[in-house]
């Protein structure tokens, strides 16, 4: 990773987004995308709010980041997130991992593993698959406990509400 980033700082920013999702009854996943040392996109899961199964935090943030880069006159990359780092509280699923590869994101830093749907090393490893035309650098476990506890609290609350 060429730019030295403060991974804990940016993961705390992603955790703020995850808490917004939690407060709105969404699975608490938060994302920030960093380019040139600054946050250019931030998002949280909005699947329930938007009634859209693709409205994962990563997908929303990728669109925001591409729009931001285009607004800055970065026309030649056409949505490419080269030199961008994405901070996610939960290991991305197959859909989001595929989108990160297609967006040519450089670095993925995530909090806690998703043993049931993780596609960045846990269940699959889409982001580092040699058969694809792009691979991401991956750092896992940044503020993992905070991410894990937030997710556990969400599902405990959900189970209580169903009783």
How should each PLM-predicted stretch be described?
Residues 14, 18-21, 31, 41, ...:
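Small-residue (primarily alanine) positions within well-ordered alpha-helices
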